[in-house]
Amino acid sequence: MAQFGGEKYGGRHTDEYGNPIQQGAGAHRGGGIMGGGQQAGQHGTTGVLGHGTAGQHGTTGGGLGHGTAGTGGALGGQHRRSGSSSSSSSSESDGEGGRRKKGMKDKMKEKLPGGHGTTTDQQQYGTAATHGQAQQHEKKGIMDKIKEKLPGGQH
């Protein structure tokens, strides 16, 4: 929503979305989902999960966004947030009574279906009476397991 008078009398006071714009040499805007808002100063802003825009001294864009540096270069360290929305624990046992932080690879493995990668081979000992086919000690494929369960004879 533009104000009356337009750019002719003092410039535009809102952006294209109707948000107020600070006027002056040190006006900066920090965007993002979790805030930022309008700030004025010479040191720029930090946008959380969005992007920050810089003035004289630059900014640090944190999280998933990006920052743009001004004439003075970026100040401060970046705030890092993970993009994971997993409900699983972020640490696991290291086998010696302590705990260690899971890496990205471990978290991704946890989300994939089909087990956790630890398989053990099972063997049968002794003798057993068989009807029809002999027992095999090989792993069966998915199709073999399905065919076994279908009525109407063995395929």
UniProtKB/Swiss-Prot annotation:
It holds the Pfam family Dehydrin. Keywords: Stress response. Coiled coil: none annotated. InterPro entries: Dehydrin (IPR000167), Dehydrin_CS (IPR030513). One of its GO terms (cellular component) is cytosol. Belongs to the plant dehydrin family. Residues 1-155 are annotated as: Disordered. This is Desiccation-related protein clone PCC6-19. Residues 136-155 have a biased composition (Basic and acidic residues). Residues 27-39, 47-76 have a biased composition (Gly residues). Residues 118-135 have a biased composition (Polar residues). Induction: By desiccation (leaves) and by abscisic acid (ABA) (leaves and callus). PROSITE patterns: DEHYDRIN_1, DEHYDRIN_2. GO terms for biological process: cellular response to desiccation; cellular response to salt; cold acclimation; response to abscisic acid; response to wounding. Residues 83-92 have a biased composition (Low complexity).
